[in-house]
């Protein structure tokens, strides 16, 4: 024990509105013509694996599902880009080139408004304002966010160094983020 306190928790919470009902995130998610966010998260019901499951033995397989009760599922609040607000916001998220989601899109033929597993998505920003408008994407383009490559690198460097100062990023990871920013196209 070196006597240092751990950093404050970054877990989503009700009391600071970083953990919310999925409908709030659905309504706030940026409008992107080719993206249809799920209307709700996957539903969650209690499952009974049998009387000795606490000892590590499942005697009911598949488990019995109690549909008389449904857990309330909450999700992290998102920023204007659709990226989660709570958590440790690495430079990928705090100086973004895309939106990262905890859900994936489904085809129009197979439940387009439903969640597909828990596989995430990477939704890159348009390069220019003209491309953004053509795509029907309300998120600012890369050119609108970062006037130059050097500006982008400076912002990544600042974000990475701040995480390092807070004890959340190793020195070698700061260097990796900066190198990746310099090589971003």
What are the language-model segments listed below?
Residues 1-185:
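C-terminal His-loop and adjacent cap/lid subdomain of alpha/beta-hydrolase
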């Amino acid at each position: 024990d070196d006597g240092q306190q751990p950093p404050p928790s970054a877990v989503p919470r009700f009391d600071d509105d970083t953990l919310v009902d999925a409908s709030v995130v659905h309504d706030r998610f940026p409008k992107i013509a080719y993206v249809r966010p799920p209307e709700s998260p996957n539903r969650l019901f209690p499952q009974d694996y049998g009387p000795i499951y606490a000892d590590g033995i499942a005697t009911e397989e598949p488990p019995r599902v109690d549909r008389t009760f449904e857990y309330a599922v909450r999700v992290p609040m998102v920023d204007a880009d659709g990226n989660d607000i709570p958590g440790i916001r690495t430079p990928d998220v705090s100086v973004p080139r895309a939106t990262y989601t905890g859900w994936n899109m489904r085809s129009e033929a197979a439940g387009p408004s439903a969640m597909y597993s828990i596989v995430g998505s990477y939704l890159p920003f348009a390069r220019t304002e003209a491309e953004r408008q053509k795509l029907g994407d309300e998120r600012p383009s890369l050119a609108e966010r970062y006037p130059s490559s050097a500006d982008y690198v400076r912002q990544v460097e600042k974000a990475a160094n701040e995480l390092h100062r807070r004890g959340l990023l190793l020195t070698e990871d700061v260097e990796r983020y900066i190198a990746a920013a310099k090589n971003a196209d």
